[in-house]
Amino acid sequence: MVVEVDSMPAASSVKKPFGLRSKMGKWCCRCFPCYRESGKSNVGTSGDHDDSAMKTLRSKMGKWCHHCFPCCRGSGKSNVGASGDHDDSAMKTLRNKMGKWCCHCFPCCRGSGKSKVGAWGDYDDSAFMEPRYHVRGEDLDKLHRAAWWGKVPRKDLIVMLRDTDVNKKDKQKRTALHLASANGNSEVVKLLLDRRCQLNVLDNKKRTALIKAVQCQEDECALMLLEHGTDPNIPDEYGNTTLHYAIYNEDKLMAKALLLYGADIESKNKHGLTPLLLGVHEQKQQVVKFLIKKKANLNALDRYGRTALILAVCCGSASIVSLLLEQNIDVSSQDLSGQTAREYAVSSHHHVICQLLSDYKEKQMLKISSENSNPEQELKLTSEEESQRFKGSENSQPEKMSQELEINKDGDREVEEEMKKHESNNVGLLENLTNGVTAGNGDNGLIPQRKSRTPENQQFPDNESEEYHRICELLSDYKEKQMPKYSSENSNPEQDLKLTSEEESQRLKGSENGQPEKRSQEPEINKDGDRELENFMAIEEMKKHGSTHVGFPENLTNGATAGNGDDGLIPPRKSRTPESQQFPDTENEEYHSDEQNDTQKQFCEEQNTGILHDEILIHEEKQIEVVEKMNSELSLSCKKEKDVLHENSTLREEIAMLRLELDTMKHQSQLREKKYLEDIESVKKKNDNLLKALQLNELTMDDDTAVLVIDNGSGMCKAGFAGDDAPRAVFPSIVGRPRQQGMMGGMHQKESYVGKEAQSKRGILTLKYPMEHGIITNWDDMEKIWHHTFYNELRVAPEEHPILLTEAPLNPKANREKMTQIMFETFNTPAMYVAIQAVPSLYTSGRTTGIVMDSGDGVTHTVPIYEGNALPHATLRLDLAGRELPDYLMKILTERGYRFTTMAEREIVRDIKEKLCYVALDFEQEMATAASSSSLEKSYELPDGQVITIGNERFRCPEALFQPCFLGMESCGIHETTFNSIMKSDVDIRKDLYTNTVLSGGTTMYPGMAHRMQKEIAALAPSMMKIRIIAPPKRKYSVWVGGSILASLSTFQQMWISKQEYDESGPSIVHRKCF
C-alpha cells in the first residue's frame, strides 16, 4: 500500500489568508513562523508591530494571545478561554475571514478546522463542546416537553404514553428518549423503556440516546439503556462512540460499564483517534491508565500516523509519556511526516520528556546487551586470554636476543662493502656510511633493512631499532658540525689520537677488572667488535696515503667521544700528553710512522674493548627494562583479574536480583490471574441472573402466561390479571361447612363451600374466616380459597402463571414462608412475589412517597413509604377495622329494640353499615342535631319485608374508628395512629408525608371520612403545616390495582422468586427478595 504524505509547504507557496497579509505589511517571523520568507520582520525594538494596519487590527482584536503572537504579548492578558479558542468577537470574526488556521502560526486556535500544514495538523474539540441540547418550549410537543422537563405526574405521563407514539421525532430528529436521557429524567426513561420504545434512533447529529446520556454524564439513564440492549458502538457524525465521550469526560465507571456491555475499545473516530489516543490527546492521565490496564492497543495510529507516545510528546505531558514508557512501547516509530517522538520533543523544547526518552533508550540498550551476553563465560574467556598473553611474552624474549646478534653481523658486512666502493674518496666513505645507516631507519620502529643477505621482510624488535637510530643521528649531526675543522691545517690528529689511546687504555683496564663475567657471557658481540676494529684499521691506512683529508680519524674519534653524553657510547678520555706537545715534521718522519702504527693498534684495541663494554651495558639495561615491563604487566594483569572477579560478583548479584524480580512478577501475575478468574465467575453469575430474568420476562410478557394478582383481604379476596384496570373476581374470604351431615341430601352436598356460594347458603352453614386481623390462622381453609380462585373464579392453571400475592404489614415470617411453600409445592407456580398491601396502594395514586392509612375488614395499618420503600420502624398496626363495626352496630340497634343474633342476621347488619352509615365532621354537634330532629333518620327494609328506622346509629357506628373507647378499647383512633407514624419518620420527609396522606381499604369508604381525617390531623400537626388527604374513589380495590401496575413493569421482572431459586434456597428465599 502506498501512502501519500502531504509535506510541509514552503513559505512562499502558502496561500495568503485573504487580505490580512497585505494589511499587516510584512510578517513577523516569530508570530507567523510559516510565513517567515515573506520579508523582514515588522517588529521594532519595543517588541510590537510598527505597521499602522497591524496596530489597527490589534486594537480591534482586543487583547492578544501570547501563545499565537509571542512578539505582541505585552498587550495584556491572553484572550484564550477554557475551550482553547479566543472569546473576543473580533477574534472570531477574524477567524471566519481567515478560513482555517495554521496550527504553527496560531497554536491556540487549532480547533478551527483541519490545518493546511499537512501531517503537522491537529484536531478540534467541537464534537465535545456543548453536550446538552438547546431546547425551546415552542419547538416541542406535549410528550417531548414532558420528557425534557420530567415534572409531569406519573399517571398523566402513563396516559400520555398510551395515546401517542413514543418514537415520534421533533424538528431536530430527537425522540422523547433522547431528551429524557440528556436531561437525566430517569423515571421518564423507565416508562419509555417499559413501553418498548426504539433504542438506537439517531438525532440530527447521528447520536443515540445512550450517547447523549454518556455525553451529559447521566449515569443512571445510561445504565438503564445498556441493560435494555442499546448498542454502545454506534458512531455519531464525528465518528465518536459512547466510549470516546466517557473517556473525554474522565468517567472511569461509565467506561468500565461500557466495556462490560461490549463497547469496542479500539473504535476510531473520523480523526483516527481511538479512546486511548483521545485520552492522551486530551491529557486525561487517569483514564489513559485505566485503558492501558484494559489492554488497549498502544501502537494504534491516528490519521497522521502518530502513536500514543508521539501525541503525548506533542501535548507536552511528561506524566503520560512516563506512563507509556513503562509499557515498553516502541519509541522509534515515525508518523507520516517521518518524525519520531524524540524529534518532536526536541523541536518543542520539552527537556523533561527528552530526558525520559534518553533514559528509556539507555535502559533498553543495557537490557539488550545483558540478554545477548553471558557474564560467566566472558569472565572465563578474559582469564584465558590473559594467561596466554603472559606465556607468549615470556617465549618471545630469547628470539629477540638472537635477532640482535644477527643484526650486528649484517651491519659489519655492510660497512666493508661501503669501504670498497669509496676508496678514492675518504670523505664520501664516511658520508655514505653515515647516511646509509640513517636512511635505513624505518617508520614502523623496527631495525632498518640493510643490503645484505637478510630478507627484506625481516623485522626486528623496537628497543634495538631505537638505540641504533639514536647512534646514527648523533654521528650524522657531529659530522656536519666538524667538517670545517677537518680541512684546517692547524689540526694535529696524531696528538689527539695518542691522548685518546692512553685514556682508553686506562679505562679499559678498569672495565676489565670490574666486568670479567659480562665479557664471557657475550662471545658473539666480541666477534662483531673484531670486525669493527678491522674497519677502523682500514680507515687509518687510507689516511696515511691522503694529504687533504687528514682530519678523518680525529672526526671519527671525537664523534665517538661526543656521543657518550646521551646514549652510553665511549666516554670522553683525558690524554696524558699536553695539548701543546708537537712532533717534528721532517727529521723524525720514520720514527713517527712506526710510533703511529703502534699507537693506532693500541687505539683500535682500546676502542674495540670500549665498544664491547658499552654494548654489554646497553643489553643489561634492556634486560632490566624487559623485566620491569613484565612485572608491570603482571601487576596490571592481577589488577584486571581482580576487577573481572569483582565484575563477576556484581553480575551474579544482579542476576540474583533479576531472578527475584522475575519471581515477584510471576507471583503478581498469578494473583492477577486469580483475580481475573474470580471476576469471570462473578460475571458468569450475573449472566445467569440475567438469563433467569429474561426467562421470567418472556414468561410474564406472553399473553398466555399473564401474571396473576391476588389481594388476600381479611373480609374480601380480589383476583385478576396484571395489566387490567379492575379485578375479575371479588368474593368474600369465607369458608362454610354444613352444620349437620345429611341436611342437604339429594342436593349433591359438599364438604365445604367458598365465597359467594357459602354466603348464599349461610343459613345452613357454619361460616369461618381463615384470616383474622390480616393474619392467616387456618391454612387449610386459605388453601381452599386459593384453589377456588384459580380453578373456579379465574379458570387458569397456577403452574403456568407467575403469581403476585399481597399481605398485611408486619406479617410474621413463618406465615410468609408457609405462603411461599404452598404456592411452589401445592400449586407448582413457576414464580411468585409477595408485596406489602400499602405499597401498591400508593402506586395507584401515582406516587412513590407518602403515608398510606389502609383500613380493611380485619386490621388497620399506617405505613410511611419513601421512594417506593416502606419504613418498618414507623409502621403502626391497629386491630380495629370493618369487622368490629357490625358487632357494635348490632349492639346499638338493640337499644332501639331490634335484635340481630345469628350469623345470617349479622350479614344483614353489615349491609346496613355499608349503605346507611357515614362519618360525622363534628360528632357532638351531630348528636345534638339527631336528638332535636328526625332529619337524620333513614329506613331499611329487611329480607322478610319488615322496615326498620336508623337514626344516630348511622354516624355512631363509624365514630368508633376515631374513638375506640366506644368498643371498650384503650387504643388510639385511626387519626392519632396516622399522626404517630408520621412523627416516627425522619424529619426530612415529614412534610412530604403530611401532604401525601392516602386512604385505602373498604373501611375508608364511609362518606365524610376524608374531611374528618383532614380536621383531626390538622389539629395534631404543627399550625403552619399543610395537610392533604387523598381519597381515591376506587380505594376499595386500590391494593389490587397497584399490584397490577407493579407486575406490569419491566424493571419488576428481576424481582420474581423463581422455582429454581426456591429449590436451591427453600422458603426462606422470600425474606431476601421480598422486602
From Swiss-Prot:
Could you list the residue ranges forming a coiled coil in this record? 399-435, 642-698
Keywords associated with the record: ANK repeat, Coiled coil, Repeat
User: InterPro entries, from UniProt?
Assistant: Actin (IPR004000), Actin/actin-like_CS (IPR020902), Actin_CS (IPR004001), Ankyrin_rpt (IPR002110), Ankyrin_rpt-contain_sf (IPR036770), ATPase_NBD (IPR043129), CC144C-like_CC_dom (IPR039497)
Basic and acidic residues compositional bias, start-end: 377-392, 401-424, 466-483, 495-530
The entry's cellular-component GO terms read: actin cytoskeleton; actin filament; axon; blood microparticle; cytoplasm; extracellular exosome; extracellular space; membrane
Note the segments forming the ANK repeats. 172-201, 205-234, 238-267, 271-300, 304-333
Q: Which family does it belong to?
A: In the N-terminal section; belongs to the POTE family. In the C-terminal section; belongs to the actin family.
Query: Any idea what this protein is called?
Result: POTE ankyrin domain family member E
